[in-house]
Amino acid sequence: MLLSIGMLMLSATQIYTIVTVQLFAFLNLLPVEADILAYNFENGTQTFDDLPARFGYRLPAEGLKGFLINSKPENACEPIAPPPLRDNSSTAFIVLIRRLECNFDIKVLNAQRAGYKAAIVHNVDSDDLISMGSNDIEILKKIDIPSVFIGEASANSLKEEFTYEKGGHVVLIPEFSLPLEYYLIPFLIIVGICLILIVIFMITKFVQDRHRARRNRLRKDQLKKLPVHKFKKGDEYDVCAICLDEYEDGDKLRILPCSHAYHCKCVDPWLTKTKKTCPVCKQKVVPSQGDSDSETDSSQEENEVSENTPLLRPLASVSTQSFGALSESHSHQNMTESSEYEEDDNDNIDSSDAESGVNEESVVVQLQPNDERDYRVTNTV
């Protein structure tokens, strides 16, 4: 579960990084405004900035080429004159309209009804570019042609050199920048997914660490089951291995199943907040009776190996013996070993005596006269 969440988070992070880099690179390459390329009779070229309207169709990707015609009337608030007739039906005409006196959507709709393929609306007494919009849904549904907005200086230049009467033509270049909601919404979705995955990963890890720490610590009810001994002079315990202070009369000692004793104030925080093991021998400190942990959990804990696990684990039988039993068994073992050593010594002495007798006999044999040995050899043959 944790591994799969980590893989998902890694994938989401990679996607987020790639999308962010590509998005910024894409936005830096995109133009913020469309352009109008104007060609006069002598093939002279000039470029004008424009701003597309928020209604109507978008310009085709290859651009829209057409002949520029001045609107009659110029404000196009009423039906305007249609474009001139030409033999080539594929020829497009673009109308130039003046701003003010009526809404933008009315101007563009009148241009569409007159037969124009696009409309250019110019500002009055200003070169500022305005984003043309509309609040009338019924009119918006009827508008099919694209339209752009230009400044007054650009409109004057177009009228002087690039109209249809003067042999010029224009090309409306579309803008390729996407609206804000086109890339902002996917960006926010990806960021949200990454944050959700990170939160899930952190919560899962916190729960697992909390469960692992709780499993490795001793509960309060388990701690109460461990015996407490009041120290008296003459006891076999002498020094607390945690605080290194000598025991005094009346000190409360916590006796662990491994027979190690510590001050209650020293060992209790260790058992309940750190690990339920003996600080010295690392043996598990679990009450022998009434332990609520299952055998499966205890076996799993015993099989777990960590950096704190001792290289030589104490035998299970040792955990149930007291210091007196340990000393008694140790003395009994020493007596047994000493008796064995004595028997071995006696055997060694007997064997050494036998060997010495054999050696003496061989020496005696070797000291016998040569003729007797020859005689024995002859009889043997």
From Swiss-Prot:
Residues 1-34 form the signal peptide. One of its GO terms (molecular function) is ubiquitin protein ligase activity. GO terms for biological process: organelle localization; positive regulation of JNK cascade; protein autoubiquitination; ubiquitin-dependent protein catabolic process. Residues 292-305, 339-353 have a biased composition (Acidic residues). Pathway: Protein modification; protein ubiquitination. GO terms for cellular component: cytoplasm; cytosol; endoplasmic reticulum; endoplasmic reticulum membrane; late endosome membrane; lysosomal membrane; nuclear inner membrane; nucleoplasm. The chain crosses the membrane at residues 183-203. Residues 285-381 are annotated as: Disordered. Its main location: endoplasmic reticulum. It catalyses: S-ubiquitinyl-[E2 ubiquitin-conjugating enzyme]-L-cysteine + [acceptor protein]-L-lysine = [E2 ubiquitin-conjugating enzyme]-L-cysteine + N(6)-ubiquitinyl-[acceptor protein]-L-lysine. Glycans are attached at N88. Widely expressed (at protein level). Lowest levels in the liver, moderate levels in the heart, intestine and spleen, and high levels in skeletal muscle, kidney, proventriculus and brain. Also expressed in inner ear after noise exposure. Residues 370-381 have a biased composition (Basic and acidic residues). Residues 64-160 form the PA domain. Residues 204-381 are cytoplasmic. It is a single-pass type I membrane protein. E3 ubiquitin-protein ligase that regulates cell proliferation. Involved in apoptosis regulation. Mediates ER stress-induced activation of JNK signaling pathway and apoptosis by promoting ERN1 activation and splicing of XBP1 mRNA. This is E3 ubiquitin-protein ligase RNF13. The gene is RNF13.
